[in-house]
């Protein structure tokens, strides 16, 4: 379902004059940018020959004095609007006007800062609109129109600066943004004020010809005088004596020259609020939000007054320190004495004893009394009773081949080779050590020459 507008009825001159006045007041009501140095005047307004297309999407409420509905609006007509104003062409003058600091620090432009106003004619045409409208009408409040989306699809902007492409493009973008704001904020207010005039005019005509309708609101009654407690019960005092005593005592407590005045409960002093007038270093603005103040104060507190709390560390598997050095020395001596000599045919690398150890051993030997004294004949007999050293034979090498390492043989298919019994190695001249014929420390070094067996190692 759609509407068919009688567009010719809007060509009344009085309607155009009223629309121009309302549109000019709306354009000049808000604060204009400093580049515009004159009022904006509506020079020409033409709604064109083609009417918009309005489609009903939903009707929510309908009665004699109210209506609510949702519509879809499409417009591709030839309406046009021409505005006239003056702009400031000197950017230095614009900068000086927008500079809100003290004149002492402002740059003092001479001839370069003089004003240069240029007239500007701005024409808007070829308007393309497509949007969804929420329309609410009430006989008492008038007509309210709200756009749910951005209705502007395209518009053509013609101005005095069309010969300069950068300025023309800049004006095109800026005017499109302003028109979107016009449809979103200014146009609903303009239509609402016009509808109120039409509704009141219709009401005056109906009141003069017919009886007042019950739907018309009654004029408001005069304001009633407020009733106070003193009017109800004049015997009661205006102020409670208890409250007066508390107030007087509180006032007297502050009449002192002491630096430490008693504080008032549930009260905040202005001197204590100075610490909250802190400018945030990160955002560079003075905050009044209590959460921001708490955040700033806590950060300053932990930054200047206190260190960050240390983390708790737990150490485990820590060896205890040995404080007694004498116990360490005795432990080392006992371990050295109780360590058995390795029974190996290979020589061992032993460290030579220190001079202190040798000196201690000599002192012990000299301190012990010699209980047994042997004669030279007894010494010879004792040396002869020493058994000869063991026969040393070279280690036998196992030269058998492990068949599991062969790539093409398996343990299941290859028969195992039987090992032949080895003959016990008999005594030979090369492998048998002769009986000791010489006593003294050079026995082993002289009699082992020519043998492959290394001499046994001695540990100090």
Swiss-Prot record:
GO molecular function: lipid binding
Cellular component terms per the entry's GO annotation: ERMES complex
Keywords assigned by UniProt, alphabetized: Lipid transport, Lipid-binding, Membrane, Mitochondrion, Mitochondrion outer membrane, Transmembrane, Transmembrane beta strand, Transport
Membrane topology: Multi-pass membrane protein
Signal peptide: none
Mitochondrion listed as a keyword: yes
Gene Ontology biological process terms in this record: mitochondrial genome maintenance; mitochondrion organization; mitochondrion-endoplasmic reticulum membrane tethering; phospholipid transport
UniProt xrefs under CDD domains: SMP_Mdm34
Alphabetized InterPro entries for the sequence: Mdm34, SMP_LBD
Biased composition (Low complexity): 330-355, 393-405
Domain (SMP-LTD) ranges: 1-196
Stretches the record annotates as Disordered: 304-356, 368-460
Biased composition (Basic residues): 304-321
Top-level taxon: Eukaryota
Subcellular localization(s) per the UniProt record: Mitochondrion outer membrane
Family (UniProt): Belongs to the MDM34 family.
Function: Component of the ERMES/MDM complex, which serves as a molecular tether to connect the endoplasmic reticulum (ER) and mitochondria. Components of this complex are involved in the control of mitochondrial shape and protein biogenesis, and function in nonvesicular lipid trafficking between the ER and mitochondria. MDM34 is required for the interaction of the ER-resident membrane protein MMM1 and the outer mitochondrial membrane-resident beta-barrel protein MDM10.
Free-text comment about domains: Lacks alpha-helical transmembrane segments, suggesting that it resides in the membrane via beta-sheet conformations similar to those predicted for other outer membrane proteins and porin. The SMP-LTD domain is a barrel-like domain that can bind various types of glycerophospholipids in its interior and mediate their transfer between two adjacent bilayers.
Subunit structure: Component of the ER-mitochondria encounter structure (ERMES) or MDM complex, composed of MMM1, MDM10, MDM12 and MDM34.
UniProt-recorded name of the protein: Mitochondrial distribution and morphology protein 34
Species per Swiss-Prot/TrEMBL record: Yarrowia lipolytica (strain CLIB 122 / E 150)
């Amino acid at each position: 379902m759609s509407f068919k507008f009688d567009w010719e009825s809007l060509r009344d001159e009085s309607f155009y004059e009223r629309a121009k006045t309302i549109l000019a007041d709306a354009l000049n009501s808000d604060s204009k940018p400093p580049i515009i140095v004159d009022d904006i005047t509506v020079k020409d307004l033409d709604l064109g020959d083609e009417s918009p297309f309005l489609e009903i999407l939903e009707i929510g409420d309908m009665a004699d004095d109210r209506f609510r509905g949702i519509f879809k609006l499409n417009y591709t007509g030839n309406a046009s609007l021409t505005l006239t104003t003056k702009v400031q062409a000197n950017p230095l003058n614009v900068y000086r006007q927008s500079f809100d600091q003290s004149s002492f620090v402002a740059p003092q432009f001479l001839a370069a800062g003089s004003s240069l106003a240029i007239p500007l004619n701005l024409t808007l045409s070829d308007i393309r609109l497509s949007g969804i409208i929420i329309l609410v009408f009430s006989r008492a409040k008038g007509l309210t129109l709200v756009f749910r989306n951005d209705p502007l699809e395209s518009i053509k902007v013609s101005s005095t600066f069309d010969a300069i492409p950068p300025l023309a493009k800049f004006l095109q973008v800026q005017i499109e943004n302003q028109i979107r704001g016009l449809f979103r904020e200014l146009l609903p207010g303009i239509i609402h004020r016009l509808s109120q005039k039409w509704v009141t005019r219709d009401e005056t005509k109906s009141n003069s010809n017919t009886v007042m309708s019950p739907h018309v609101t009654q004029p408001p009654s005069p304001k009633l005088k407020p009733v106070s407690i003193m009017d109800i019960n004049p015997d009661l005092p205006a102020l409670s004596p208890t409250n007066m005593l508390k107030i007087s005592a509180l006032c007297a407590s502050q009449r002192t020259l002491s630096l430490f005045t008693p504080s008032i409960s549930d009260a905040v002093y202005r001197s204590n609020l100075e610490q909250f007038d802190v400018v945030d270093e990160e955002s560079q603005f003075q905050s009044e939000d209590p959460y921001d103040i708490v955040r700033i104060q806590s950060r300053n507190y932990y930054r200047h007054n206190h260190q960050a709390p240390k983390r708790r560390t737990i150490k485990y598997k820590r060896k205890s320190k040995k404080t007694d050095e004498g116990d360490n020395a005795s432990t080392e001596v006992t371990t050295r004495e109780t360590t058995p000599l390795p029974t190996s045919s290979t020589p061992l690398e032993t460290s030579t004893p220190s001079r202190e150890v040798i000196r201690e051993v000599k002192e012990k030997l000299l301190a012990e009394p010699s209980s047994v004294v042997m004669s030279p004949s007894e010494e010879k007999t004792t040396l002869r009773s020493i058994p000869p050293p063991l026969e040393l034979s070279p280690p036998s090498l196992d030269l058998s081949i492990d068949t599991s390492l062969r790539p093409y043989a398996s343990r299941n298919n290859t028969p195992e080779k039987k090992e032949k019994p080895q003959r016990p190695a008999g005594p030979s001249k090369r492998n048998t050590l002769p009986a000791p014929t010489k006593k003294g420390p050079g026995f082993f070094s002289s009699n082992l020459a020519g043998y492959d067996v290394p001499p046994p190692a001695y540990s100090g």
